[in-house]
Design a protein with these regions (language model features):
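Membrane-spanning alpha-helical segments of multipass transporters and channels
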Residues: 1-176
Length: 176
């Protein structure tokens, strides 16, 4: 009896395999640092009757631009400094763009709405996602609690999208 090996979606090295997890984590941590450094609430002294929506999105634009810049630097660093394997670099940049948009909006909204409590929630969510996002181990190997909650958080989806950009697309799984 002989076994045969049929490699599907091969990865050149361990660094390329772990890049999606650490890139997503870096984008999240960068957004957390943004809300820690910059004030989420704008001064309203010189504004004439601003609506809540104008106040929210007017200040969010700064967070959005900074988070996009950070995502670009992270992805460019992955590709050109770390030289990870990547079959679809353009799609990886697009994934970084949408991941950054999602994370920055979620983190900004929680911080804007709940202040320091929102920041604490963001950190707790980050810890739960690190432990149970299927970024380092398959979901099937995680404790029961993590298997139940991992689908509620954004990390697994962003990691899966980045994995597909790096290793190869699996049908229409990327757009689902």
């Amino acid at each position: 009896v002989q076994t045969s090996v049929n490699k599907v979606y091969t990865i050149d090295n361990y660094g390329s395999a772990m890049a999606p997890f650490y890139s997503v984590l870096a984008i999240w941590v960068g957004c957390v640092i943004l809300v820690a450094i910059l004030k989420p609430h704008a001064r309203t002294d010189n504004l004439i009757d601003p609506t809540r929506t104008e106040l929210f999105f007017g200040r969010y634009i700064l967070f959005f631009i900074m988070s996009q810049l950070q995502a670009f630097i992270i992805i460019a660093g992955d590709l050109y400094i770390l030289k990870i394997q990547c079959l679809h670099p353009g799609l990886l940049y697009l994934t970084g763009f949408f991941t950054s948009l999602t994370f920055s909006l979620l983190i900004y909204a929680l911080t804007y709405s709940f202040g320091d409590v929102g920041k604490a929630v963001v950190v707790i969510v980050m810890v739960l996602q690190i432990a149970g996002s299927s970024g380092t181990f398959p979901v099937e190997l995680l404790p029961e609690f993590n298997r139940r909650i991992y689908i509620l958080f954004p990390f697994p989806y962003a990691i899966d999208m980045m994995r597909e950009c790096i290793c190869g697309l699996y049908g229409t799984h990327y757009v689902q």
